[in-house]
Amino acid sequence: MSLLTPDIGLLFWMLLSFGIVFFVAAKYGFPVIVKMVDERNAFINKSLEEAKQANKRLRGIKEEEERLLKETYNKRIFIIKEANEMRIKIINDAKEKANFESNRLMKNAKENIQKEKELAMQDIRQQIAALSIDIAERVLRKSLDNKHEQLNLINELIKELN
């Protein structure tokens, strides 16, 4: 028996043992292995599908985030614009009220000045009238014959009043 050329009996028994092992493996081992490979394949496919769905949801969340950011930005712009409009309106209202109040105060001040002026003019007229009467009375007391004396008397009386 040579190592390189086996005998027919050995070959027969090797083929028979290989056939029995193959038959047992095919009947009991391969279905389990195939089942495990199929389960693993199904698990991998399921995981891939879940990953795709997760990516899809993540994209949806990112799109929602971008939409919310844009919406928030637009609302912020609107609120800022509205606040500026309110600020301008408040400033304009305050200016308008200040102008109205200023005009009212100026009108009242002018009226008061006019009244004071009229009262002062009336007082001056009364004083002039009283002075005129006083001067006339003093002039009449003196002799009316000399004009030069009358003028000196009037000048003297004016100096006394000052």
From Swiss-Prot:
It is a single-pass membrane protein. Belongs to the ATPase B chain family. GO terms for molecular function: proton-transporting ATP synthase activity, rotational mechanism; proton-transporting ATPase activity, rotational mechanism. Pfam families: ATP-synt_B. InterPro entries: ATP_synth_B-like_membr_sf, ATP_synth_b/b'su_bac/chlpt, ATP_synth_F0_bsu_bac, ATP_synthase_B_chain. The keyword Metal-binding does not apply. Keywords: ATP synthesis, Cell inner membrane, Cell membrane, CF(0), Hydrogen ion transport, Ion transport, Membrane, Transmembrane, Transmembrane helix, Transport. F(1)F(0) ATP synthase produces ATP from ADP in the presence of a proton or sodium gradient. F-type ATPases consist of two structural domains, F(1) containing the extramembraneous catalytic core and F(0) containing the membrane proton channel, linked together by a central stalk and a peripheral stalk. During catalysis, ATP synthesis in the catalytic domain of F(1) is coupled via a rotary mechanism of the central stalk subunits to proton translocation. Component of the F(0) channel, it forms part of the peripheral stalk, linking F(1) to F(0). This is ATP synthase subunit b. It comes from Azobacteroides pseudotrichonymphae genomovar. CFP2. F-type ATPases have 2 components, F(1) - the catalytic core - and F(0) - the membrane proton channel. F(1) has five subunits: alpha(3), beta(3), gamma(1), delta(1), epsilon(1). F(0) has three main subunits: a(1), b(2) and c(10-14). The alpha and beta chains form an alternating ring which encloses part of the gamma chain. F(1) is attached to F(0) by a central stalk formed by the gamma and epsilon chains, while a peripheral stalk is formed by the delta and b chains. Its main location: membrane. GO terms for cellular component: plasma membrane; proton-transporting ATP synthase complex.
